[in-house]
């Protein structure tokens, strides 16, 4: 397994799954610094910008891109 795959697996394992991937709210992103914060920002705000439902949110509870 190469370094990139190991890093991505480690990043996924350290992401909290219970709060919509909001990494900054849980640990400030200090674990991987800007890389982890950027990954969290993409997951957090991409759905809100597009007004889509995030995949972890039931459609009936979705309101303008937020659960």
From Swiss-Prot:
Q: Which UniProt keywords apply?
A: Cleavage on pair of basic residues, Disulfide bond, Ion channel impairing toxin, Neurotoxin, Secreted, Signal, Toxin
UniProt key word Repeat? no
The terms describing its cellular component in GO are: extracellular region
UniProt propeptide residues:
21-48
Q: List the disulfide bonds.
A: none
Q: Which domain of life is it from?
A: Eukaryota
Transmembrane segments in this chain: where?
none
Tissue specificity annotation: Expressed by the venom duct.
Q: Where is the signal peptide?
A: 1-20
* PTM info: Contains 2 disulfide bonds.
Where in the cell? Secreted
Q: Which GO terms describe its molecular function?
A: ion channel regulator activity; toxin activity
Known function:
Probable neurotoxin with unknown target. Possibly targets ion channels.
The similarity comment for this entry is: Belongs to the conotoxin L superfamily.
Q: What is known of its domains?
A: The cysteine framework is XIV (C-C-C-C).
Protein name as catalogued: Conotoxin Cal14.2c
